[in-house]
UniProtKB/Swiss-Prot annotation:
Pathway the protein contributes to: One-carbon metabolism; tetrahydrofolate interconversion; Amino-acid biosynthesis; glycine biosynthesis; glycine from L-serine: step 1/1
Protein name: Serine hydroxymethyltransferase
Lineage of origin: Bacteria, Pseudomonadati, Chlorobiota, Chlorobiia, Chlorobiales
Keywords, in A-Z order: Amino-acid biosynthesis, Cytoplasm, One-carbon metabolism, Pyridoxal phosphate, Transferase
Biological processes, Gene Ontology terms: glycine biosynthetic process from serine; tetrahydrofolate interconversion
SUPFAM superfamilies named in the record: PLP-dependent transferases
Species this protein is from: Prosthecochloris aestuarii (strain DSM 271 / SK 413)
Length: 440
């Protein structure tokens, strides 16, 4: 995408973008929630669709002139339905957090009880964290992983549910390297009369490719982001495998009298006008492009390689005496407990950044350090796989990471980081991103 006009008009922003292009091109991205969007997705993001207000939904807008943005939103919805095998989808949420808020506000009242995975055990802010709306407006209870295995103990989840009787149970994570047993969660939800929501923001691409458990047959609601493993623009989405009459008794007046609203109608109204106004039509157009890409056979090949690369990295880390929380990975990421290496997550993140490798510090289960320091790092393979890297690259990268972490606290740390940075730049230089290349 050419930005010569920006270079002339706003050199400061142009320089920032230029430097970010170099960073993405010459360094290795291992943050699990990041990826490279295709040039086609980027073009849609930067299209004239950004100029159009379109409050409402296709065919029912509050503004005129929406006939072409309606085409884009209809395509996004139909492609998402095909990709995930769902009956209902709302592609308007601006983010995964907005999608989660839309569901929670649709079925809960302030003070209602919810359950979600503890943030420090791999959950997400919107699953009940005390610093987030989900933990401030609702009575949030967190389940966790077993101290020894690092796995979610479903018996403990059931015990908690029977004790606190939640209105909503959330299954999903931002730093859990195993799959979720959605069927078992649904059985627990049914026992206590709770709604079940799956937040698949991280593994959505792997689920769409059929590589992980499908939440659609078991969960009342499924939310996701559209970037991460889906390689789309930054945004959110709400889905339901099957629509159903809302059990809260919300009705609507029709010519034939009052009827019970379908759950899809409740959610649509909660997104707009409930928590949002005008949708981001350029982003929705880009979502449609990304879903179209994900429906191609090449996307499943990509998803298979993402998981293979993660498995190879985890095994290599384990062979070098690193502690992978839960003992390995079945998805695209791993959470590494660095306490046996006597290095904090913050130190590891900073050293690896100097070495041209981007990761994020992350709390580990039962961490005794603050979120600003942490005892671990989170690593993911979506972006490196988009570069065309395979298992051999994954193993070589782990060896480089080990060199950097092993040099922590030594006088040679700067030299080691410089050497590794040169090797990373050379490795990235042999693997151009092509259709996913971040260019000016």
């Amino acid at each position: 995408m050419s930005i010569e006009i920006l270079q002339k008009q706003d050199k400061e922003i142009f320089d920032a973008i230029s430097n970010e292009v170099l960073r993405q091109t010459e360094t290795l991205e291992l943050i699990a929630s990041e990826n490279f969007a295709s040039k086609a997705v980027m073009e849609a993001c930067g299209s004239v669709m950004t100029n159009k207000y379109a409050e409402g939904y296709p065919g029912k807008r509050y503004y005129g002139g929406c006939e072409f943005v309606d085409v884009a939103e209809d395509l996004a919805r139909e492609r998402a339905k095909k990709l995930f095998g769902c009956q209902y989808v709302n592609v308007q949420p601006h983010s995964g957090s907005s999608a989660n808020m839309g569901v929670l506000f649709s079925v809960l009242k302030p003070g209602d009880t919810i359950m979600g995975l503890d943030l420090s055990h791999g959950g997400h802010l919107t699953h009940g964290s005390s610093v987030n709306f989900s933990g401030q407006l609702f009575d949030a209870h967190s389940y966790g992983v077993d101290r020894e295995t690092g796995l979610i103990d479903m018996d403990r989840v059931e015990d908690m549910a029977l004790s606190v009787r939640p209105r909503l149970i959330i299954c999903g994570a931002s730093a859990y390297s195993q799959g979720f047993d959605f069927k078992a969660f649904r059985q627990i939800a049914d026992k206590v009369g709770a709604f079940l929501m799956a937040d698949i923001a991280h593994p959505a691409g792997l689920i769409a490719a059929g590589l992980l458990n499908d939440p659609m047959p078991h969960c009342h609601f499924v939310t996701t982001t559209t970037h991460k493993t889906l390689r789309g623009p930054r945004g959110g989405m709400i889905m339901m495998g099957e629509d159903f009459e809302n059990p809260m008794g919300i009705t609507i007046k029709t010519k034939a009298g009052r009827r019970t609203k379908m759950m899809s109608e409740v959610i649509d109204a909660e997104i707009m006008p409930g928590i949002q106004g005008g949708p981001l039509m350029h982003i929705i157009a880009a979502k449609a492009v990304a879903f179209g890409e994900a429906l191609q056979p090449e996307f499943k090949e990509y998803a298979v390689q993402v998981r293979a690369n993660a498995a190879a990295m985890a095994q290599k880390f384990i062979s070098l005496d690193y502690n992978i929380v839960s003992g390995g990975t079945k998805n695209h990421l791993m959470l590494i407990d660095l306490r046996n290496k006597n290095v904090t997550g913050k130190v590891a993140e900073n050293l690896l950044h100097e070495a041209g490798i981007t990761v994020n510090k992350n709390m580990v289960p039962f961490d005794d350090k603050s979120p600003f320091v942490t005892s671990g790092i989170r690593i993911g393979t979506p972006a490196m796989t988009t570069r065309g890297m395979t298992e051999s690259h994954a193993e070589a990268i782990v060896s480089l990471i080990d060199r950097v972490i092993g040099a922590a606290g030594s006088p040679d740390a700067g030299t080691v980081c410089g050497e590794v940075r040169s090797e990373i730049k050379a490795m990235c230089g042999t693997l151009p991103l092509n259709d996913f290349s971040p260019t000016l």
